[in-house]
Amino acid sequence: MASETASASQWVSPSSRPQHIEQLISGVDRYNPQNLDVLHDYLAQQLDDGSYDLLANLAILKLYQFNPADFNYVVVINILLKALVAAPLPDFNLCISLLGEAPLPTVPVKAEKEATTTDADNAGSLSGDDDDDEVVEKPKDVASAGHLTDPLIVRLSQLSTLLFQARFREFWSTLASESYSDVRDYAAKISEFENAARRVALNSVKGSFTSISEKRIANYLNLSGSQLAEFINAQDGWKLADGTVSVPANPDNEIKATVIREEISLDQMHKFLAQAQSPLLRA
């Protein structure tokens, strides 16, 4: 419970947040578009040093929502990439929800015309009247993130889903695919991006295993050999030896027998037995 409280505290107010940013996003100044440059500089700091501050980044997206003329596509992509590797927290979806009014392409309500017939028209066709077929518009099945169809944002959304669902091998193979080269170009400019994704995998393993094979965790982390050993041994409490990785004990992976003991007083037992008797015996 203490660790969960500490994690929530870091989410609301990370220790890396400067005092002037704390004051800015805690008051009405967060809605002042003149503060965008300050928030942009703070985001650049996060990209450089690997820190992360969701609430400050959400403040940027909120200002874009109120001031579409200030919208900066590159800033949005960087914010989404930082939120992506915060899984399993819902940060990515929170960011997407604030892009609803952004100047980006969206799924059209009616995107494609198809020739279809109504039930009445079908009945007419059976009687030989085929000239009244009505052409109606049907929604097109378009890949989207929320309702946004910007190709890069859709790809980020797909990566976010893979991380959230703990499909780590698929995450790495998708990220390495040719169609995701633009994602890799942006991610390469973010300090510790891949290691942040690896920590998502470690947290998932930490809650489910007491030990795991080296081969399996290598696939989860997209590392092998000395790089894998170096990364694992750098984690507090983790050890790699003889092809097996030992996971540190924590409340989620400890196996404990649960003993439930209920004490019933003699008085309570007397009342229970009295209520269980048939009316005939009570008389």
Curated annotation (Swiss-Prot):
Per the record's keyword annotation, is Cytoplasm included, yes or no?
yes
Keyword Protein biosynthesis on entry: yes
Keywords assigned by UniProt? Cytoplasm, Initiation factor, Protein biosynthesis
Segments of this protein annotated with the region Disordered: 114-135
One GO cellular component from the entry?
eukaryotic translation initiation factor 3 complex
The UniProt entry, under InterPro entries, shows:
ARM-type_fold, CSN8_PSD8_EIF3K, eIF3k, PCI_dom, Transl_init_fac_sub12_N_euk, WH-like_DNA-bd_sf, WH_DNA-bd_sf
Pfam families assigned to the protein according to its UniProt record, in alphabetical order: CSN8_PSD8_EIF3K
Q: Its GO biological process terms?
A: formation of cytoplasmic translation initiation complex; regulation of translational initiation
Q: Where in the cell is it found?
A: Cytoplasm
Q: Which GO terms describe its molecular function?
A: ribosome binding; RNA binding; translation initiation factor activity
Main localisation: cytoplasm
Q: Where is the PCI domain?
A: 52-263
Function field: Component of the eukaryotic translation initiation factor 3 (eIF-3) complex, which is involved in protein synthesis of a specialized repertoire of mRNAs and, together with other initiation factors, stimulates binding of mRNA and methionyl-tRNAi to the 40S ribosome. The eIF-3 complex specifically targets and initiates translation of a subset of mRNAs involved in cell proliferation.
* HAMAP family in the record: eIF3k (MF_03010)
Q: Which family does it belong to?
A: Belongs to the eIF-3 subunit K family.
What is its quaternary makeup? Answer: Component of the eukaryotic translation initiation factor 3 (eIF-3) complex.
Name listed for the protein in its UniProt record: Eukaryotic translation initiation factor 3 subunit K
Instruction: Recall the taxonomic lineage recorded for the source organism.
Output: Eukaryota, Fungi, Dikarya, Basidiomycota, Ustilaginomycotina
